Amino acid sequence: MNKISIAVIGAGRIGAFHAKNLASHHKVKVKTIYDLNSNSAKKLANVLNSNVADNDKEIFEDKEIKAIFICSDTPSHIKYLELSHLYNKHAYCEKPIHLDINVVEKFLKKIKNHKNSIQLGFHRRFDPSHQKIKKILKSKKYG
């Protein structure tokens, strides 16, 4: 069975969280990890049996990689989203895209006709309804 090759940019807490979840899926191969801190990238790559990119562009130029998980610092998100657009990759980006709404609006206009998916991670773990469900589940009242 062919696996989809994915790269993760950012090997910190959230990058490692996503990379490990992705690697647990039978149809996914976390092929490459990139982080400005090469030690963090190497540590995560060792756990996942992945490659480490020497630079960010290496990920985008790799034709096997179909999707990019952007888990780096917020100021770099637009750069990596634009590269995803340029290299025609699917992208998942941690929130926020950028801190300046004008930059976000300009980017959204630029990618209006992007052929692949771009998804923004917007977890709701602090949403009151999610907190209530979590509390109920932990109580084991319903199984």
Residue ranges and their predicted role:
Residues 124-143:
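Predominantly a Rossmann-like dinucleotide-binding segment in NAD(P)-dependent oxidoreductases
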Residues 49-56:
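Conserved SAM-binding strand-loop segment of SAM-dependent methyltransferases
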